[in-house]
Each structure stands twice: as structure tokens, then as C-alpha cells.
């Protein structure tokens, strides 16, 4: 009897301690795929409890990125299921850990493509957490090694628990329904444009005029560049002009490609399908630069012959992957201050609609970004 009483007291103390620390997890519901067929179904799971340096975000909006489609369909290799995609997240803070200073309850907050890193390697020390030498922890389809190897699940859900250092402050005056895509598509295009140092009058090209490309055009026009858009359809010609592009080239029309070699200081390729990068290399001026941020499926990955690099007037080709947290915050503040937002189509949070939206992304039948209203989640 005495032993049972002691055990009962110990259990009560442990339970009280666990409650005080917030142990027990955060019940979460959302939409997941359970295999690579792209069919979304309701899914309930538990996120880890809010830690001392973490916040809990009520998700208001989640963008659909083309890379979500690639992951869901295993275009880049085997994945683990069930999978809740979504790394373009905008919401409101509903809980803060006791050490949090960056946010308070009620603030808008966002999450992009990553939610953790080692924070001490050379890349992390230079605010390039996406290149963490121990591996950045992705917002979904990953393992959170700092929270009990919990599988990360993304933003097609009603909440997210994240370290305050990996959450982005969303200005109170932001058009919140349009913010989410900026946290992937926005930073993916902003970062190489910023790092190249585009200036007024530079002649630049944007290859691919979709979710990424239409944001790139807005950033470049704001900087005073002379922008040409390259795409495979006539359907977006008027949109490119409306956003400030001075020229639109349908690459399926050979006549429109004439006279473009050695014309551009910088070209940004956002193309997520198979194409010929050498065509764009040849369009660069002496010392011109081609930045590649679009990634096709593994079976459609383009190749660049070495001679196309060596023999072409000191032209440079480089890749760029999203941006660090500091640069992402800079991008968001700049975008909101300058009225740069994606053009979005808001859809309800139901499995059938999300599944249909994915197919439309594959078919190129979206202008320019689908955003899920997670407030409609039932």
C-alpha cells in the first residue's frame, strides 16, 4: 500500500511537471497524401508542444508551390508518407514560449521552406541557414532532429509550432492573403536578383512566367531594369506587359528568338520543366550571368555541356536556393513596403479542391499562385 501511494504521488508530480512545461503535444488537423497519387485526404496528427523558444502559429493561408507537387509525386526521388505539404505559410501567433521576445500573441507570422539548422556552421554563421553543413530542417518531408526526430509536416494544416528564430515577422499592414507565396517564391527570386546587384537600365530576362517568374518581374521592374519575359505560351503576354516587362518572347516562335544573342546582363531561369539552358547562356553579354532557381523533375533535368560554359565569353551560371532567414525577412519587408505581391487565386481547404489545384499546376493552368484559405478547414 505504501509503495502504491508513493508511485501515485510520483506520477502526479510528473504529470504536473509535464503540464507546466507544455508537454503533451499540439493536436493538428490538415490534408495529407498517403502515396504518390496526389490525392489529398483529411489527416489528424500531433505536433510537439511549444517550447521555451518557440511559437505556435494559427495558419491562415498556405501557398501551393510547384515543388510541393514534385515532392508529392516523388518527381525528385522516394518520399515518406503520409505527407502534409506546404512551405509557404502565413498566420497569426496564438502561443509563445517563455523566452520568446520576437513575437507576441496576435502578431502575424510566417514560415518558409525551413524550420531549423545547426546555427553554428560556417553557412549558418553567415545567415545562410539553407546551406547548413549539418542539413537545414525542411518545413515538411523531413525529420526534426531537435524535437525527438519528429517528422515535419507542412502548412496544409491548422497550426505550426516553430522556433521564433525561424519564423518571419509579417508587417501588420501586409495583405495577409497574399503573403504566403513570398516566403518561397518571393525569396527564391529576390535573393539572386539582390546578390547580382541589378541596377537601373540593366537588360535582364526572366525565363518562365509563373509563380516565381511574375514576382521576379516585379522586383526587377522596381529596380529599374529593362525586363524581357520568356515563356512558352501567348496567354501571359498581356500580364507581362501589365507588370512592367518591356518585351515578351514566346520561345516556341522561332521568329521571336532572332537577334537575342549577347543582349542580356542577367537572366533568371525559373523554369520547372525540361528546356535548353544553353539557349539562354548564348543570350548573355560578356560577363553576363544566368541564375537557375527552377528545378524540373529528375527525368526532365536539363544538362549544360561544358563547352557552353568555357567557350562563351566569360558568362557565368549559378544556382540559388531560397534564402536565409535574415534575407527572407528583408525580402518580406521590402515587398510589403513596395506593394510587391503575388497574384493569387484563393481556394478552400478541402481535399478535392487541393487535388484539382495540383493537377492545374502541372497543366500550367494557374495565374499565378494558388493559396489555400486554411480558415475554411472543417
Which residues does each predicted region cover?
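Short N-terminal strand-loop motif that marks the start
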Residues: 21-90, 154, 158-162, 166, ...
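NAD(P)H dinucleotide-binding glycine-rich loop of Rossmann-like/cofactor-binding domains
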Residues: 118-207
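C-terminal hydrophobic helical "lid"/dimerization subdomain
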Residues: 22-26, 325-378
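Glycine-rich cofactor phosphate-binding loops and adjacent beta1-alpha1 units
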Residues: 196-200, 228, 232-316, 377-378
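Mid-domain Rossmann-like dinucleotide-binding core that forms the NAD(H)/NADP(H) cofactor-binding site
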Residues: 109, 171-253
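Bacterial Sec-dependent N-terminal signal peptides
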Residues: 1-22
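Glycine-rich beta-strand-centered segment in the early N-terminal region that forms part
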Residues: 48-62, 75-125, 130, 153, ...
Amino acid at each position: 500500500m505504501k509503495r502504491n501511494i508513493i508511485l501515485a504521488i510520483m506520477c502526479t508530480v510528473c504529470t504536473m511537471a509535464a503540464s507546466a512545461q507544455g508537454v503533451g503535444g499540439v493536436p493538428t488537423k490538415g490534408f495529407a497524401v498517403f502515396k504518390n497519387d496526389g490525392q489529398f485526404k483529411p489527416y489528424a496528427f500531433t505536433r510537439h508542444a511549444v517550447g521555451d523558444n518557440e511559437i505556435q502559429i494559427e495558419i491562415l493561408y498556405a501557398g501551393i508551390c510547384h515543388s510541393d507537387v514534385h515532392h508529392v509525386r516523388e518527381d525528385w526521388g522516394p518520399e515518406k508518407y503520409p505527407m502534409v505539404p506546404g512551405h509557404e505559410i502565413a498566420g497569426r501567433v496564438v502561443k509563445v514560449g517563455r523566452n520568446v521576445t520576437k513575437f507576441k500573441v496576435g502578431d502575424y507570422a510566417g514560415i518558409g521552406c525551413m524550420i531549423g539548422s545547426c546555427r553554428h556552421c560556417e553557412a549558418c554563421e553567415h545567415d545562410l541557414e539553407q546551406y547548413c553543413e549539418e542539413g537545414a530542417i525542411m518545413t515538411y518531408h523531413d525529420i526534426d532532429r531537435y524535437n525527438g526526430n519528429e517528422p515535419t509536416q507542412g502548412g496544409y494544416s491548422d497550426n505550426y509550432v516553430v522556433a521564433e528564430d525561424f519564423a518571419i515577422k509579417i508587417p501588420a499592414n501586409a495583405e495577409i492573403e497574399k503573403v504566403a507565396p513570398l516566403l518561397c517564391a518571393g525569396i527564391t527570386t529576390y535573393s539572386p536578383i539582390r546578390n547580382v546587384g541589378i541596377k537601373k537600365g540593366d537588360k535582364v530576362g526572366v525565363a518562365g512566367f509563373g509563380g516565381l517568374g511574375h514576382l521576379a518581374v516585379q522586383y526587377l521592374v522596381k529596380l529599374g531594369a529593362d525586363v524581357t519575359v520568356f515563356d512558352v505560351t501567348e496567354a501571359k503576354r498581356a500580364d507581362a506587359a501589365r507588370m512592367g516587362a518591356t518585351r515578351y518572347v514566346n520561345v516556341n516562335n522561332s521568329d521571336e528568338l532572332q537577334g537575342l544573342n549577347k543582349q542580356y546582363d542577367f537572366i533568371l531561369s525559373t523554369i520547372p520543366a525540361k528546356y535548353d539552358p544553353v539557349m539562354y547562356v548564348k543570350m548573355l553579354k560578356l560577363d553576363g550571368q544566368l541564375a537557375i532557381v527552377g528545378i524540373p523533375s529528375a527525368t526532365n533535368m536539363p544538362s549544360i555541356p561544358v563547352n557552353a560554359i568555357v567557350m562563351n565569353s566569360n558568362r557565368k551560371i549559378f544556382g540559388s536556393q531560397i534564402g536565409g532567414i535574415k534575407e527572407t525577412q528583408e525580402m518580406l519587408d521590402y515587398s510589403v513596403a513596395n506593394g510587391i505581391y503575388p497574384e493569387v487565386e484563393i481556394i478552400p481547404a478541402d481535399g478535392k479542391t487541393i487535388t484539382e489545384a495540383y493537377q492545374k499546376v502541372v497543366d500550367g493552368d494557374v495565374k499565378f499562385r494558388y493559396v489555400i484559405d486554411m480558415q475554411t478547414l472543417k
